Amino acid sequence: MAFDFDVIQRFYQRLAERVSAAREAVGRPLTYAEKVLYAHLWSSDRPRPFKRGDAYVNFGPDRVAMQDATAQMALLQFMQAGKSRVAVPATVHADHLIPAKNGAGLDLAAALDMNREVYAFLASASSAYGIGFWKPGAGIIHPVSYTHLTLPTKRIV
């Protein structure tokens, strides 16, 4: 993946601004976890001290990554919402419907045959709503997400 360094710089500048505002609102230094969480408050929430076990806090992700077995229902629900595009970058990874039985080549061929309709739906729906699609055999969701799609302190769901 080619990273857009302007986007990265803006993200980290915004991160620093949000952490600074949170530290001022809380009135003390923040732990690393608090910095990451305060930096991802939903846009309508303002930084303030949150009492553990008492407060309800809305967070926004930087990215959504879905695997093929659950993305089907998620995309159907998204389609029902009437939105034309996703609000944050999102990807579908076709990896969970590939059985590990006879070796990579045979397993991929079997999955392509068995799940052809599912993969066609995922690719089509992803394309229609601006969602990236990692086709079967393109990689396993976890290492792909961490090596190609995110950066330190970014929140991925």
Which functions belong to the PLM regions below?
Residues F5-I8, L106-L112, I141:
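Conserved short loop/turn motifs at secondary-structure junctions
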Residues D68-T70, A100-A104, H142-Y146:
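Short, solvent-exposed polar/charged micro-motifs at secondary-structure junctions
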Residues L76-G130:
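Glycine-rich, flexible beta-strand/loop modules in the N-terminal catalytic cores of phosphate-handling
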Residues Y129-G137:
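Short secondary-structure capping/junction motifs at helix and strand boundaries
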Residues T147-T153:
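Conserved small/polar residues in nucleotide/adenosyl-binding loops
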